[in-house]
Regions:
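Glycine-centered tight beta-turn/hairpin loop motif at sheet-sheet or coil-to-beta transitions
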Residues: 20, 40-42
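SH3/SH3-like beta-barrel fold
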Residues: 35-39
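Intrinsically disordered, low-complexity, charged/polar segments
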Residues: 44-59
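Short beta-strand-centered aromatic/proline hotspots
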Residues: 23-29
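Mixed-charge, Lys/Arg-rich low-complexity intrinsically disordered regions
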Residues: 1-15, 21
Length: 59
């Protein structure tokens, strides 16, 4: 399955709007609305991009 419209592409940097203490994360993979992100302080997290709008970030 490909990325859903509006989801960040792999290798991009994002922040979780409700978890600022997680820090910046790099998108590892995208499968539809399922986005796997490796955050600085939370490790790998699977995000449902249909529910959470990840914010663009810069490392």
């Amino acid at each position: 399955m490909s990325a859903a419209p509006g989801t960040p592409p792999p290798a991009s940097y994002v922040r979780h709007p409700d978890q600022p203490h997680w820090g910046v994360g790099q998108v590892q993979s995208v499968d539809g609305h399922r986005v796997t992100v490796n955050f600085e302080h939370a490790g790998k997290v699977l995000i449902n991009a249909a529910v959470i709008a990840l914010e663009p970030a810069f490392p």
